[in-house]
């Protein structure tokens, strides 16, 4: 069982540990997700933990495996068998100097030291990424072209040739868009519109070279629109 908590700058002890809630005119203690995970022996997933403020330090004793004392109700909660804590972070708690992950913060070093191991997740291999896309799209050749395109862009990014990357998530967005419009050019274009014009054009030009069946130089035909009947 996994209990997932999406962390933001506003996340505090009340959100995590719990607090009193007004129920039918009375104040009633309500466990937060951390206590629920502790008592059920579940996996606690702290998602995007580097978005947190220093209020996240209320988890110190829990990360040490000692449980937590709920001072507001005078109860100590020990972790049930199987309880564990995982956290995800784009910056490993070091913040984002280049602004790519704006909103992330530098986390307390003592807090970070309480996580014994860190796993770095790189992009999937080409074969794995193809399998992911093939689950969502029947056009296997299109999936292969997309994966090759994304792989080239990432290599160019790491070499300093471009300032953005195409993530696996972005490729998934494209095949989902393709399932809607049945048009490769449109699916790719609407999914790279989020990038600045220069980067977008560079990505489209590169895909032109990867897939001979696609041409972004021409106009994409407009979608037929239903005729509206205006009442007289």
Model-assigned labels for residue ranges:
Residues 1-232:
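C-terminal regulatory/interaction module of P-loop NTP-utilizing enzymes
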């Amino acid at each position: 069982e996994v209990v997932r908590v999406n962390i933001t700058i506003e996340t505090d002890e009340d959100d995590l540990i719990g607090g009193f809630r007004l129920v039918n005119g009375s104040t009633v203690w309500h466990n937060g997700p951390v206590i629920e995970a502790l008592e059920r022996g579940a996996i606690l997933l702290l998602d995007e933990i580097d978005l947190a403020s220093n209020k996240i330090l209320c988890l110190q004793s829990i990360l040490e495996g000692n449980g937590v004392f709920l001072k507001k109700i005078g109860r100590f909660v020990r972790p049930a068998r199987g309880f564990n804590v995982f956290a995800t972070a784009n910056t490993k708690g070091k913040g984002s100097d280049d602004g790519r992950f704006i909103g992330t913060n530098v986390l307390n070093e003592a807090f970070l030291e309480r996580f014994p191991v860190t796993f770095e997740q790189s992009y999937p291999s080409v074969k794995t990424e193809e399998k992911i896309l093939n689950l969502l799209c029947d056009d296997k050749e299109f999936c292969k072209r997309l994966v090759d395109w994304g792989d080239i862009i990432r290599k160019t990014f790491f070499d300093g040739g471009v300032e953005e990357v195409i993530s696996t998530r972005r490729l998934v967005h494209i095949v989902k868009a393709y399932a809607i419009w049945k048009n490769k050019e449109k699916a790719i274009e609407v999914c790279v519109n989020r990038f600045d014009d220069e980067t977008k054009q560079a990505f489209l030009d590169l895909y032109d070279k990867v897939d001979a069946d696609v041409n972004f130089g021409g106009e994409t035909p407009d979608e037929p629109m239903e005729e509206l009947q205006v009442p007289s």
